Amino acid sequence: MIRATRVLGQHRWTEAAADSVLLDFDDRHRRRLAMTGTRGLAFVLDLAHATALRGGDALVLEDGRLVEVVAAAEPLLEIRASDPHHLVRLAWHLGNRHLPTQIMAKSLRIRRDHVIEAMVKGLGARVIEIEAPFDPEGGAYAEPSHAQGHDEHDHHHGHDHHHDHGGHEHAHHGHDHGHAHDDHVHDEHCGHGHHHHGHAHAHDRK
């Protein structure tokens, strides 16, 4: 099966993509995984190191074709503050818990978490449940995909309860198309893959 061995970051490619893969936040963190695009193109993501893929990135196949990464909508909490100072205070509390957080102009977005929802409401925030792509801040030590224009990526986990507190998230998500199946692609970082509802449950974490 053809492999995707490199990544081009957002705005670093102009050619038409041969296909696209629809991936949630967890699924955009994988090093090696069998995938099928929305138009049926099957390939194996086979990168050298872990890197966070973002919507708009392109996976480069061995024959030069590109596969666009599309960030899937998923269940989120949008946290709204009364003023900028309040927003900074809320962001501090989320950061203190090492929660992946997407910073918007006037709000914050996190994965749905009832405990955190209760906490920020207690701090005076307004919380709204939404469905949207999740693109959190990478953190001081994150390795962005554009830094990996060659081949550096890893990790991507589908569905089920993924905990990441300090890296702890709680995700319950499913997509049927542009999906990633693990198809038991094994390497030294991968234990075993479970193909389940068009999602990968693999264990090659960062």
From Swiss-Prot:
| Ranges of compositional bias, category Basic and acidic residues | 148-169, 177-191
Instruction: State the InterPro entries in the record.
Output: UreE, UreE_C_dom, UreE_N, UreE_N_sf
**Pfam families reported in the protein's UniProt record:** UreE_C, UreE_N
**MF (Gene Ontology):** nickel cation binding; unfolded protein binding
Where in or outside the cell it occurs: the entry states: Cytoplasm
Which N-terminal stretch is annotated as signal sequence?
none
| CDD domains recorded | UreE
Q: Where is the composition biased (Basic residues)?
A: 192-206
> Its domain of life?
Bacteria
Q: Where is this region: Disordered?
A: 136-206
Sequence similarity: Belongs to the UreE family.
Concerning HAMAP family, the annotation shows: UreE
Quote the function comment for this protein: Involved in urease metallocenter assembly. Binds nickel. Probably functions as a nickel donor during metallocenter assembly.
- What is this protein's name? Urease accessory protein UreE
Q: Which gene encodes it?
A: ureE
